[in-house]
Amino acid sequence: MGPTALTFYRAAKRLQALPRLANMVATVGDRLHNSHVDTKAVLHPTVELGYGGIGVIIAPGVEIGAKSFISQNVSLEPLPGRVGVPRVGRDVYIGVGAQVLGPVVIGDGAKIGANAIVLDDVAPGTTVAGIPARELKQKVPPTGT
């Protein structure tokens, strides 16, 4: 399949001691994939991007936890007029075209539907969808005795 947006992100992160080269590598990745994964974002090594990260925008400061999957054309960015960026937990699925905006926290195991616009926190294990995103289903934790 060739290099993905994550390949260029990781290479640029490793080259940060050489800022001009890191910037050049990041720019090539951005242009090839019509995306931008900022090197100031923190992505766990097990994060995956759908279709190589085509159209994905991940702003500086965004944190994405282990085993999370970000589909193509997803935006994780600040909301104009509000301070802060999204934080995505572990094992989160974000569907095609979704936008997660502002200082929201996406809990572990949450699922975000295609084209959803998330403006509020999403509880762990919750499925949300719609514009604006609203809860569709919440995973019931097992009860122990």
PLM region spans:
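Terminal amphipathic alpha-helical/low-complexity segments used for targeting or macromolecular assembly
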Residues: 1-35, 133, 140-145
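Left-handed beta-helix
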Residues: 39, 44-45, 50-51, 59-60, ...
